[in-house]
Amino acid sequence: MEAVVNKFLKYISFDTKSNEDSNAHPSTEGQMVLAKELARELKEMGMIDVSVDSKAYVMATLPANTENHVPTIGFIAHMDTAPDMSGKDVKPQFVENYDGKDIILNKEKNIVLKVKDFPEIKDYIGKTLITTDGTTLLGADDKAGVAEIMTAMEHLINHPEIKHGTVKIAFTPDEEIGAGADYFDVEKFNADFAYTVDGGTVGELEYENFNAAGVKLTIHGRNVHPGSAKDKMINSITVGNELHSMLPENEVPEHTEGYEGFYHIVAFNGTVEETKMQYIIRDFDRKKFEERKATMQKVVDTLNSKYGEGTVELQMNDQYYNMKEKVEPVHHIVDTAFKAIEEVGLVPKVVPIRGGTDGARLSFMGLPTPNLFTGGHNFHGKFEFIPTFAMSKAVDVILKIIELYSK
């Protein structure tokens, strides 16, 4: 346990917050700094073919030490932390032998991790938790994944008696801004399949994610002096409100769960003359996903018929798809991970990802990639925490998957 925790504490000291407004790759310099450090550590521990490219993708190989015909397995995690909150000067706090009560993160600022807000924390009574000090996020998403993969590789190198096939590892930049797979060289990586280590609760295994589209709307109004505006003015803000009201009221993130999809308005800025709106559309079912996009198009067409052609301009683009259709043909990769989770003494929880991962994109690039847990909770904010035992269990699962395939 100590090794994975120490690595995690080291990696969260690097500020690697990604920036969605940047056109650079990686989007922030801190990611390249961490990439170079990881490459240095990989070389030092004895991995081969260690590389960091100009976009900060780190790749390395652990060569096989068995004559058996064993598939080449990849493990992938991302180095960046979410833009939602600062990841600079993270001050982790240890809560040992957690007693099931509220945790004071920052007395001075009265920031408290409350059981009533996050009841799942009671699952960890008696365990050691790592929390924030309430002023930053923690960075378990996904530096816990990085630390877990690094620890597993170090263990295999230090224990050559454990037989294994070729293992490939990669650490990616900019996952949090949706660009983690943009420059991922699948051919160079050269694995038969892979796993991202980027999930949440201990025991989780994910191989289904949303189909996703992004929507940008520009509404053109007609501004006329309000004193003489009757039958002349078109207020673009009002049209925007009308557009929003034409979408299903309850099919939004705050009223959906499990396999339910949604429309989510993420930006709405306007004047009488011009309003800009942004939505994301999400659904697990491809048919329902296409129907949601058609609904958005129909709403726009209706408003253009009412207010005049070109009043509402629509840009809609698909962002990623449900990896399930690419993972199903090689379902053994899910079955093996499920078995590995069981064999290390956990109860596997197969859950749909209400979001996307690098693995979703990679699966459509020819590298089927389900997602394994890191053990963390409440990612992207000051209430993020991770139980230390969950991190060592994640290491155990990585090692167990490799072991099961080497038999």
Swiss-Prot record:
Gene3D superfamilies: 3.30.70.360, Zn peptidases
A GO term for molecular function: metallopeptidase activity
Catalytic reactions on record: Release of the N-terminal residue from a tripeptide
EC number: 3.4.11.4
CDD domains: M20_peptT
Cellular location(s): Cytoplasm
Active-site residues annotated for this sequence: D80, E175 (proton acceptor)
Co-factor note (free text): Binds 2 Zn(2+) ions per subunit.
Sequence positions that bind Zn(2+) 1: H78, D141, D198
GO BP: peptide catabolic process; proteolysis
Domain of life, per lineage: Bacteria
Keywords assigned: Aminopeptidase, Cytoplasm, Hydrolase, Metal-binding, Metalloprotease, Protease, Zinc
Entries under Pfam families matching the protein: M20_dimer, Peptidase_M20
PROSITE patterns, alphabetized: ARGE_DAPE_CPG2_1 (PS00758), ARGE_DAPE_CPG2_2 (PS00759)
Top-rank EC class of the record's enzyme: hydrolase
Alphabetized InterPro entries for the sequence: ArgE/DapE_CS, Bact_exopeptidase_dim_dom, Peptidase_M20, Peptidase_M20_dimer, Peptidase_M20B
Keyword Lipid metabolism among UniProt keywords: no
Family, as annotated: Belongs to the peptidase M20B family.
Its biological purpose: Cleaves the N-terminal amino acid of tripeptides.
The protein, known as: Peptidase T
Origin species: Clostridium novyi (strain NT)
